[in-house]
């Protein structure tokens, strides 16, 4: 299995007709610059950068995004007021990721162009409130006026149609593309995602940064520590540094952090991004036609 980097998955997604995103995460600024430059060479279609705002080098990250003329930025894990106006003044479209109506309204007030409302089912870092996508989307739709993108528990055309019936204007899909040939994830982690069933993930570490993980040995260590009424420092000491890299990119399925969504129970294979996109769109169209033919 050939391992490709983050930019390959983003450019493959854009080339397949959807918006590919480069996840800046805890990436060093100059590494992000390299990914952006190579992504631009790999596709002439739009792509964006996803920027969690909790990292200390956020100023350098944003400067590079502007210097490299990225046109779309998804922000998360921070106050949207901090960067939205500055980015929009540079001609950049800003989308903010939220897990509740409260933060959706704050993002709209901050002037973002669209909102991603992400339900509790989503993999990786999430909100502390256990609000499902099924509940969150219509609640947010009822009170915001800007475009709404659904996320969390979406890996099929059926789920895409369902969220759009609930009021979403589009969808953001993460977990399904982890199990793609272009994904930078380690093959051992990809295989663990394919193997995972419903109930094999759980949201934990809510006192730090809530995260949905596959229940492996590291997850079990966290649960054992919770039985001892740990302090925040106890949890930080157990988590350590680079735990996610160890699990998802180095392939340590025992001690690593394995971030994936509940929808892993519907991920059965590893295939090219273009095939995944085609499957989702084909199923979406088929499901839409079936729904139109229903007799109630």
Place the predicted regions along the sequence by residue:
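Short, small-residue-biased leader/transition segments that mark boundaries at the very start
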Residues: 2-6
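Alpha/beta enzyme core
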Residues: 7-16, 34, 38-42, 55-149, ...
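Conserved active-site-proximal phosphate/metal-binding subdomains
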Residues: 127-149, 155-296
């Amino acid at each position: 299995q050939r391992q490709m980097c983050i930019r390959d998955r983003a450019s493959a997604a854009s080339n397949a007709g959807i918006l590919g995103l480069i996840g800046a995460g805890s990436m060093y600024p100059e590494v992000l610059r390299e990914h952006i430059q190579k992504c631009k060479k790999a596709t002439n279609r739009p792509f964006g950068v996803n920027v969690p705002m909790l990292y200390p080098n956020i100023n350098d990250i944003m400067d590079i995004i502007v210097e490299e003329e990225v046109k779309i930025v998804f922000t998360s894990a921070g106050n949207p007021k901090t960067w939205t106006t500055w980015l929009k003044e540079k001609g950049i479209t800003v989308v903010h990721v939220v897990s509740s109506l409260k933060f959706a309204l704050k993002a709209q007030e901050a002037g973002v162009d669209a909102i991603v409302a992400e339900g509790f089912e989503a993999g990786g870092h999430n909100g502390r409130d256990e609000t499902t996508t099924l509940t969150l989307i219509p609640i947010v739709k009822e009170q915001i006026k800007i475009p709404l993108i659904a996320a969390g528990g979406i890996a099929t055309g059926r789920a895409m149609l369902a969220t759009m019936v609930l009021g979403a204007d589009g969808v953001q899909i993460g977990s399904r593309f982890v199990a793609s040939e272009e994904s930078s994830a380690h093959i051992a982690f990809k295989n663990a995602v394919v193997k995972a069933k419903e109930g094999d993930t759980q949201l934990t570490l809510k006192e730090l940064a809530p995260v949905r993980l596959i229940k492996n040995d590291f997850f079990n260590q966290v649960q054992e520590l919770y039985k001892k009424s740990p302090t925040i420092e106890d949890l930080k000491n157990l988590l350590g540094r680079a735990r996610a890299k160890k699990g998802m990119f180095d392939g340590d399925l025992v001690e690593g952090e394995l971030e994936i969504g509940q929808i892993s129970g519907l991920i059965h294979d590893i295939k090219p991004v273009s095939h995944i996109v085609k499957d989702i769109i084909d199923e979406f169209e088929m499901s839409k036609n079936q729904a139109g033919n229903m007799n109630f």
